[in-house]
UniProtKB/Swiss-Prot annotation:
<protein>
    <recommendedName>
        <fullName>Chaperonin GroEL</fullName>
        <ecNumber>5.6.1.7</ecNumber>
    </recommendedName>
</protein>
<dbReference type="GO" id="GO:0005524">
    <property type="term" value="F:ATP binding"/>
</dbReference>
<keyword id="KW-0963">Cytoplasm</keyword>
<keyword id="KW-0346">Stress response</keyword>
<dbReference type="Pfam" id="PF00118">
    <property type="entry name" value="Cpn60_TCP1"/>
</dbReference>
<comment type="similarity">
    <text>Belongs to the chaperonin (HSP60) family.</text>
</comment>
<comment type="function">
    <text>Together with its co-chaperonin GroES, plays an essential role in assisting protein folding. The GroEL-GroES system forms a nano-cage that allows encapsulation of the non-native substrate proteins and provides a physical environment optimized to promote and accelerate protein folding.</text>
</comment>
<keyword id="KW-0413">Isomerase</keyword>
<dbReference type="InterPro" id="IPR001844">
    <property type="entry name" value="Cpn60/GroEL"/>
</dbReference>
<feature type="binding site">
    <location>
        <begin position="23"/>
        <end position="27"/>
    </location>
    <ligand>
        <name>ATP</name>
    </ligand>
</feature>
<dbReference type="GO" id="GO:0140662">
    <property type="term" value="F:ATP-dependent protein folding chaperone"/>
</dbReference>
<keyword id="KW-0067">ATP-binding</keyword>
<dbReference type="GO" id="GO:0016853">
    <property type="term" value="F:isomerase activity"/>
</dbReference>
<dbReference type="GO" id="GO:0005737">
    <property type="term" value="C:cytoplasm"/>
</dbReference>
<dbReference type="InterPro" id="IPR002423">
    <property type="entry name" value="Cpn60/GroEL/TCP-1"/>
</dbReference>
<keyword id="KW-0547">Nucleotide-binding</keyword>
<comment type="subunit">
    <text>Forms a cylinder of 14 subunits composed of two heptameric rings stacked back-to-back. Interacts with the co-chaperonin GroES.</text>
</comment>
Length: 120
């Protein structure tokens, strides 16, 4: 029963990561699997599940604070192109995203749809 709960949790983590960030689902899935595996191992060894939960929550808070402290604003078209290029794994796509963002502005919306038409 715990394994099924763990699998559902990992699935939910991947879905939520995709919904919120649109990227990082693999990293989130690997982290969630490790948390479930190690959590179950610790509970089986006699650890208090609520204590584990509190420890995980504190760790998440600390990591989140540190990530926010080290985060850098992406402001220029060149920075946007570089960041998007890294995320897409393709500098040409990064340049296209930067160009689109330049046209719609910081509060604009860019919709990307898959096409079955070659070259479009």
């Amino acid at each position: 029963p715990y394994e099924k709960i763990g699998a559902e949790l990992v699935k939910e983590v991947a879905k939520k990561t995709d919904d919120v960030a649109g990227d990082g689902t693999t990293t989130a899935t690997v982290l969630a699997q490790a948390l479930v595996r190690e959590g179950l191992r610790n509970v089986a060894a006699g650890a208090n599940p609520l204590g584990l939960k509190r420890g995980i929550e504190k760790a998440v808070e600390t990591v989140s604070e540190n990530l926010l402290k080290s985060a850098k604003e992406v402001e220029t078209k060149e920075q946007i192109a570089a960041t998007a290029g890294i995320s897409a794994g393709d500098t040409t796509i990064g340049d296209l995203i930067a160009e689109a963002m330049d046209k719609v502005g910081n509060e604009g919306v860019i919709t990307v749809e898959e096409s079955n038409t070659f070259g479009l």
